């Protein structure tokens, strides 16, 4: 039996050793195929997805190897799965062959619907996972909430530093090139499926983890992949986890040096933890426009606030105005969204592009 603790990850890669057997399955979830929601749902049933990125030779293997032999993995009641989120890395075939003979869960999506979502991918300007901080003296609400950018530009490439304020239909033309590297992030599957042809493969349509179907799908998967059945009372399984609201929240409103208030989503692909000793003050605000919104602050901050009635009223008015602006911005961004019909219309007007893209799909479907 191999003692992985005595072998450096870099040497294990050179020796072609399979990864340590401390994971239940492999999840092959390409981008814009519901991967963020799937990852969050799995976490809710006690499965943590071990993701690894990087193009360089062996980088993903080494990262996963080191985690699997760490105390964070060994001394943990959670279960783990390896997540493959793209196929853009050196010696990808070797990486796949060094995975254990485990079940493989593959998430699928209608390719035109996936292309639509690819075009619509949003971040907030200061970074997807950054918590935006707002000073209560800043009353330019339209500017505060105008933070969304569309990160797939007309060349089809991902640019986290973009200033692009609208989704680009022209990126379809770039993505119709069969050699475009972004196809390895959202289309290319066949090579991976070929590697795992001797494994047990479970295919899931993304629409099976939307709304009421989510619970049934997770219950079915729990019996196949050996994880806990979902809690039927957990509302997260019925929520839309990725939306403009997800991009713009959470944020922190700084009232003064003693009071900070958090505005967040109750359910999100982002893992928002309500800080210990915080209290939910959502019901204090009349402009709450979505059941997913939650407003909270540390109890001592709230005690300090209610002891100053003038300041308390100022905060109520400020956050209500902020919420009105937030709702307005969300509607603006929703109206920018490219629809499936827009994608099909683009193909109708650009026949050569449509043919090239169809050739790519024919190769993969």
Please provide the spans of the model-predicted regions.
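PAPS-dependent sulfotransferase catalytic domain
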Residues: 1-235, 243-275, 279-281
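PAPS-dependent sulfotransferases, especially Golgi type II membrane carbohydrate sulfotransferases
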Residues: 1-18, 224-365
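Extended amphipathic secondary-structure runs
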Residues: 25-28, 40-41, 178-224, 322-338, ...
């Amino acid at each position: 039996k191999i003692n992985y603790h005595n072998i450096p990850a870099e040497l294990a890669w050179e020796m072609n050793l399979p990864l340590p057997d401390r994971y239940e399955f492999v999840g092959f979830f390409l981008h814009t195929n519901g991967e963020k929601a799937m990852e969050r749902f799995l976490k809710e049933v006690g499965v943590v997805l071990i993701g690894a990125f990087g193009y360089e030779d062996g980088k993903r293997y080494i990262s996963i190897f080191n985690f699997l032999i760490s105390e964070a993995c060994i001394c943990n009641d959670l279960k783990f799965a390896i997540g493959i989120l793209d196929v853009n890395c050196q010696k990808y075939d070797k990486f796949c062959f060094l995975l254990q003979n485990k079940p493989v869960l593959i998430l699928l999506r209608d390719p035109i619907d996936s292309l639509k979502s690819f075009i619509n991918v949003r971040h907030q300007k200061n970074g997807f996972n950054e918590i935006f901080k707002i000073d209560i003296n800043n009353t330019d609400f339209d500017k505060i909430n105008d933070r969304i950018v569309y990160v797939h530009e007309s060349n089809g490439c991902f640019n986290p530093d973009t200033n692009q304020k609208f989704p680009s239909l022209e990126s379809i033309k770039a993505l119709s090139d069969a050699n475009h590297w972004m196809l390895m992030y959202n289309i290319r599957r066949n090579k991976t499926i070929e590697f795992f042809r001797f494994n047990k493969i479970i295919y899931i349509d993304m629409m099976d983890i939307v709304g009421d179907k989510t619970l049934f799908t997770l219950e079915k998967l729990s019996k196949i992949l050996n994880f806990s059945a979902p809690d039927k009372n957990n509302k997260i399984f019925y929520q839309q986890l990725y939306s403009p609201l997800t991009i713009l929240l959470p944020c922190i409103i700084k009232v003064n040096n003693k009071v900070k208030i958090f505005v967040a989503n109750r359910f999100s692909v982002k893992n928002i933890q309500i800080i210990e000793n915080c209290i939910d003050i959502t019901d204090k605000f009349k402009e709450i426009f979505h059941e997913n919104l939650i407003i909270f602050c540390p109890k001592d901050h709230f005690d300090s606030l209610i002891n100053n009635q003038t300041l308390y009223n100022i905060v109520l008015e400020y956050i209500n105005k902020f919420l009105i602006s937030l709702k307005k911005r969300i509607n603006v961004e929703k109206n920018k969204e490219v629809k499936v019909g827009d994608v099909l219309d683009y193909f109708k007007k650009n026949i050569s592009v449509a043919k090239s893209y169809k050739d790519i799909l024919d190769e993969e479907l």
